[in-house]
Every structure is written in structure tokens, then in C-alpha cells.
Amino acid sequence: MDSAFFNEVAKKWQEKWENNKVFEANPSNSEKYFITVAFPYTNSPLHIGHGRTYITADIVARYQRMIGKNVLFPFAFQFTGTPILSISESIKRGDSDIISDFINLYKISPEKVREFEDPLKLAEYFKEDMKRMAKALGLSVDWRREFTTIDPRFGQFIKWQFRKLKEKGFITTATDAVGYCPNDNFPVGMHDTKGDVEPEVQEMDVIEFEGNDVVFPTATSRPETVFGANAVLINPEATYVLIRGSNWVLSKEAFRKLSYQRELVPEREVQGKDLIGLTVKNPISGKDVKVYGSKFVDAKMGTGSVMAVPAHEPLHYLGLSEVLSEVEVIPVISTEGYGDFPGPEVLALAGTKNPAELKDYIDTLYREEYYKGVMREDIVDLVPDYMRSIVKDRIAGKRVPEARRETVELLRSLGKHDLIYEISNGPIYCRCGAEIVVKVIRDQWYITYDNPLWKSWTMKALDRISIVPEEARRDMAKAIFSMKRRACSRSRGLGVKLPWDESQIIDSLSDSTIYTGFYTVAHKLSHDPSKLNDQFWDFVLLGNGDASEVSKVTGISVEELKDLRNEFSYWYPLDSRHSGRDLVQNHLPFLIYNHLAIFGESLLPRQIVINGFVRVGGKKMSKSFRNIYPLYKAVEEYGVDPVRLALTISSELLEDTDFDVNTVKAVTDQLRRMYDLAVNLSKLRENESTGLPEKWLLSIIHYKVKEVSDLMNSLDLRKAFNIILYEYYEILRDYLSMVSNPNTSVLRKAIEIWARLISPGAPHIAEEIWHIFNEGFVSLTRYPVPEELEVDGQAVIQLEYIRHLINQVKEISSMANKQPEKLIIYVSNSDELGILRAVLRGLKERKNLRELSSITGQREEYLRSLVERVQSLPPILRELIVTYPLDEFKTITDNLNFLVRRLDVDEIQVYRSDEANAPDIKGKKSNALPLLPGIVII
């Protein structure tokens, strides 16, 4: 039984589900559950990272359906934005890597790949490919409601949303510095870059050092140190450009980047080595300083020149010491824990001249000086007389943050200050391959996520939403708190045109904030898009207006309008939104912001579920890294249900996980065992004999059903399916080891319950097993509840004690690295069991050792040992022993045959620890405690 078997089973049941419209959902009198996933960019196949998110959501959808809710799980496709455009243009440019992936990895013909030069054909192809894969994965989707973001009806919906945002003052135009692709010519965000990195734009201060016909605009993040600047450093190997008008000297790389921020006209080029030796003035001190060459200057950073402050910057000291026999150091900041010259001090401490190895030391120095540093009083002596009173009053003796602000103001008043922008977390590359630059864009449309009232409203709204897992809430709050206004349109690409500026396309993170509302009516919108005007959406989504009046304006009947309104009112709000962790920084906050703005607090999503990434070879999987593991490949190789469960049980929800072949194979083997067990059961002769093993089996399943249900409700899916897949099977195996002729009715009931439990995670094999004994779809049966099974506490405590004993023996054998042939077991007397019961009752009542000693009459040392060891007992034993009697000696002797078989030993001898004539082998006789026998392996 290999992947072919599982995939044949999957195909069979997927066809039956589709033919019977099993997952189509309509408003009813039942409690509803509306669940969605972040829709995918249609620029390549679904990969196992998508699979993890979609499978998690599908498990929740199937579980909620089985507990009686009317579940809507729809699906759609994102055509908007640069991910599609950049792939299309890469193919047009003949990008050999991307074309090779499409042909060799994704198995697409070269002729078809050439068609992808048209972005719409690319998107349409992968939309159909993704839909096939989503169906093959067994997602319980209502496919009537699918749409794409370039559907004209969806476009009308988004235009309505944007007009609402603009009316409320949440959209504005502004001039701003943004991450920008110089090749594609539009602003970029996380989804546009290789590695999905959000460009972070940082302001850098520029201080002008002026000479004869040249000005070196030195870029710095620490302008307050200009008092100690005694040189300008450039890269001698770089080419520089003299700028007409300003006489700025910029590296060629800086000239290219800064051309996106300001008007720059080149005068001429000059080699860095030819600039060495020039004299310029420090604008604060007025002193002449020299220009020196240093290999430590990165011509790509800032302006390509830096002011050298060797007293406070190790690399500046290092650079100057390579060209000067003696380096002058001028201290300007005093910091606790450092001497007068922290730059050379840190260099000596680090014991290296490697910039990469120095980075942490330098970062620490910068941080310490910023938060703990104070400007020295004697900096007054470094400036001209006319400036001294200003420096004394505003800068000298001040803490660094305040001094920084005042220094910038002073430089501005001198006309020697400017600002540029840099990508602080660069270099970052667009998906097209170009390095991202900062561009100052004028008259760009922005959504004002930095609006203080809107942000405060959103922060408060977060408290109303369940975040799963809860530890992700802090990251969500941090993302909202840090939110800045965001460019919401582009000049190119697929998507919806901005309603008041048709030269602009709404970007992919702005048309995907309330689209979940569109699902509720998408399957009923066959109308001419022009009819879906603002009055239509106001009525259907907000309940505003009169149906008769809206009908007159739109030509849509009153009955249809009311039906559409009923669809939305029934399904909204969203009950559960599922996405990967990467969307915490953008999409998920945007979702909350926009729901508040459009629908208000009452229609906020009730729950947001966030999962970690799937790694390949230890690295985050990303289309831009070209390390995608396509979902179809995993399914072809291992089968649908094994892949579904492997992705579910491999890690906790928020943790990243590696797609582990060994895990998939283990899941495959376990599913095969359960299937074989069901098939073999169907061939057994009927047997209704009932004894202790049958009572135990049904009782322990009662407890497992309760445990699994609690875990499913809290979305602890990893633990839930590990219990269903492995612990449940061990229970069945133990039952079969206990009896020579199993009760077929009891065993059938146990397997049917297992099929219902596993169904949300492995729905296809669950249907196959269910149909060995039953009609109908297991997907539509009720999820098991504990009340289906009676509990015989006496049977449970006896056989759980035996199973725990088996585990103890296995642990001892494993530690001894020995397979025993014979066992000697010592059990404690019944009086000690009474002490244990009293201790467990006391612990439930939170009594301390002194109180327990008073209750039991036992020494605290003995009780401490008992409490420590009893923690190793299974919870069910600790719970039941308080209520039910247990004769350990009799229980073991009654089940000796089972113990011999399960432990594969030749002989087991059992003694009471208080039996005077019992031999004391290896001192284990006195080691016996209640429920914790002394065990000797031989």
C-alpha cells in the first residue's frame, strides 16, 4: 500500500463529495461557522507551505461541521500585484532560472511557458492548477463562491470599499520615501521582494564638508559626533560623481540611488584616489580636515563618504591608522563603562580588524553611547567663538538623544544639513532581481494606518479577537502599534483601478482586507457589474437604504437584494481567519483596520489563527528563494492523507517545521495498520462475549474522546492527532493482546469512532474505513462525544495500571539496554495505597507537606518521595485511584499471560513487598511504592 493507494482512495471520495455537493453551504437555522484562508498569488503552484495553512483550516472546518455547525469554507485567487507581473516579465527577459523551474520542477511545456509572458495567461494557468491541487488535497470548499481579484464584480466591491475609506479620511495623498524597484518602476512591499522581506526606510543625516568647488555630503546616523570629526573618508577604489549646482561629491552607486530621491545632474566623474588629499572644513568646528581613502568605506551606503570620528568609531580609527602614523582622537561623548577614547578601546577589546567581526562590538558601543552617553562640556572649546554660547546652552552636558536633535538644528541654521533615505535592512532585491532603492514619490495615494485614532481603535479591537496561538497576540499588537501609512496603489499590473484615479491600480495588500465579505454573495452575483453600485453594496453589506429604492436604481429585484442581504447577515462576521506567520506584519493588521472602518466592531473577525512556516533544508521556503517544494510533488510521492497528517503533527501551530520524509512514512504505516485492522475485522466471525478487556476498551476510548475533543477545541492539533494516530492504535493493539477472540461489536465500534476522530485530518481513508461498515459520509456524521461510551472505572484502573507497568518495564529495559527474559515485581501493601489516596486528595486541595503529614501520620521525607514519584503516573491513574479500589498483586497475577506476551519474557514472579519470605533481589523489595512497583529485570 503506497502513495498510489492513498491517492486512488482520495480521488474516489473527492468525486463522491463533489457529485453530492457535500460542502456547499447555504443559510439555515443551524449555528454557522465561516472560515477562510489567505488566498494565494497565482504565479506558481501551491507548495507545502500553503498546504500547512490550508490543511489546518480544513481540519477546523471539518471538525466544526462534524460538531453540528453549518460551515462555509470558500476559496479565491489573488491576481493583483507584482508577484505575477515580475514572474511574467522575468520570462519575457529570458530568465533561465525561472524558465528552468517552470519546465523541470513544475513540469510545464516550453510552449506553455512562453505564453506566460502575458501575466493574465500566467495567472489563469496557475489559478486552474491551484484549484485542482486544492481539490486533490481534499479541502472541503464550497467552490460555487470562487472568484479572482480581477473579476469585474469584485472590482465594484473594492471600489466601494475605497470610496468608503476616502470618505472617512483614511486615504490621502502625500509625498513620501518608499522602497522602490527601479526596474519595475513601482513601490514594493514584502510580497514583492526575494525572501519576502519588508523594506525598512531609514532617514540619514547628511553633513556637508565644503572645500574649493567640492562639497562632501557625509551621511551619518550620529550627527552629534560631528564635533569630533577630523577627516573625511572615501573609498579610493570607487568612482565618484561631481553634481552640478550643489558641487556634491557622490559615489557612482550613491548617485544612482539618490537620483530616485532628488534632482541630480552629473557634472563629471572622478576616481576616488584622485580626491585623496583635498582639504574641506568641518562645518561645526570650522577647522580644515583632509580627505583620506579607506577600504572600510562602502561606496554603496549613504553618499559614499563619511566623516571620520576616530574617538567613537572603531572603523574610522582603523581606517585612519592605516594612512597616518599618528591618529588624532577628539572625544565628544562621556559614557559610563568606557574611557575617553571608546573607538580604539573597542578595537583593542575585539582583537580583530575584520568589519564583520567588529559589527556586534560597534552596535553595542552605539547603543551604549545613545542611551547612557552625555556630551562632554569641553566640546565648547572645539567651536568658533560665535557658536560657543549656543553649544554650551543646548548641547554640552546634554544626553545624546537631546544633543542629537540640537546638533541637527544647529547644522540646519548653518545651511550644512540635509537628509537622505536608505534601506536600513538592505540589500533587498525585487523578485525581478533589481536591488530595491528608496524613492521619494509625490502625490502617492496612501491608506493612513498611522492615523492615531484609527490605530488606537484597532489596538483596542484586537482585545475582542481570539488569537491562536495566544503568544502571537504580542506580535500582532506590535505590528499595529508600529504601523505607518502605506502606499495603496501602483502604476502597473493586474488589479482594480483606483476609482478616482484610473491611472493607478490598487495593490495586492489593499484589495485583500475585507474580501471575505465578498464570499458571502459571490455565487449569486450574475448581474451586469455596472449595476453593483455603491447603493447596492450599502444595502447588501451594511443594511443601509430601502430595498425598493435600491431595486429601482440597480434594476435588481427586491427579492434578490433581500436574499443577498440575508446571505451576508447570516455568514458574517468571519469566525476564523487562517494565515501564515509572515502576514502578521501586514495583511492581518490591515484586516482588522479595514473591518473596523467599513463594518464597525460588531463584525470584526472572531478568531485569527496563525501558523509557522514550512522549511526546506532548514531554510524558510519562498518562491523568491527558488526552494519551493510543490504540493503536487509531495502528494504524488506520499499520498494525500499522509501529507495532511504529517504537516499537522510535525510541530506546534506557531513553530516552523521541516517537511520530514520519516514523519510522512511513519504516518503512512500507521494509517495502513488501521485500514488493515478494519478490513480484517470485517472478515471475523461475530463474537459478542464481554469481559474486563471490553469494558476497559470502551471506557478508555471515552477518556480519549474527551481529551481529543478538548484539544480540537483549543486547536492543539498536533497533540490531538498524535493521540488519534498513535495512542489510539496502541489501545486497540493492547486490547487484541488481552483477548484470544475479540468482541467484534466492540472492536467495530472502536474503529468507527476512530474513523470519525481521524476524519478532519485524514478524510479520505476515514471514508474508506467508515464504508466498510456503514453508509453515508463520515464527513457528515457527528464527531464522537464521550457520552457515547459508558465508563467502567474499575476496569480502567486495573488495565491502565497494567499498561503503566508495561511502560515502566520498557523504560528500565531501555536504560539497561537489555531485553529481559525474566521479571521480578514487588508491589506495595494496601495500607500504603490508602496513604497515596489521602495524599492525592490533599494535593487536589492544595495542602502542603506538613498538612499531608498530619493527615496521614507519615514522615514528610517519605511523603516528599511519594509525591515526586507519583508525578510519573498517568493522569488517569492519579484520578481514578482516589475513587476506585485496586489490588495491585491480584491485578498483576490476573493479567500475567497478557504481560508475558506484551513484554516478550519467559517468566514473571510477583511478590508483596511486606511478605517476609519474599526474596529481596537487588534491594528492590523496599523500593515499592503504591502504583509504582519495584521491578527487577533478569
UniProtKB/Swiss-Prot annotation:
Q: Which catalytic reaction applies to this protein?
A: tRNA(Leu) + L-leucine + ATP = L-leucyl-tRNA(Leu) + AMP + diphosphate
Q: Name one GO biological process term.
A: leucyl-tRNA aminoacylation
Q: Is Nucleotide-binding set as a keyword in this record?
A: yes
Could you tell me the EC number(s) of this protein? 6.1.1.4
Motif 'KMSKS' region, chain ranges = 620-624
Compartments in which it is found = Cytoplasm
Known InterPro entries for this protein?
aa-tRNA-synth_Ia, Leu-tRNA-lgase_arc, Leu-tRNA-synth_Ia_arc/euk, M/V/L/I-tRNA-synth_anticd-bd, Rossmann-like_a/b/a_fold, tRNAsynth_Ia_anticodon-bd, Val/Leu/Ile-tRNA-synth_edit
Q: Show the CDD domains listed in the entry.
A: Anticodon_Ia_Leu_AEc
UniProt superkingdom:
Archaea
Q: Which GO terms describe its cellular component?
A: cytoplasm
Enzyme class of the recorded protein, top EC level: ligase
Pfam families, sorted: Anticodon_1, tRNA-synt_1
Chain positions recorded as ATP binding sites? 623
Chain positions of motif 'HIGH' region: 40-50
What are the protein's GO molecular function terms?
aminoacyl-tRNA deacylase activity; ATP binding; leucine-tRNA ligase activity
Assigned keywords, A-Z = Aminoacyl-tRNA synthetase, ATP-binding, Cytoplasm, Ligase, Nucleotide-binding, Protein biosynthesis
Task: Give the family per the record.
Answer: Belongs to the class-I aminoacyl-tRNA synthetase family.
**UniProt name for this protein:** Leucine--tRNA ligase 1
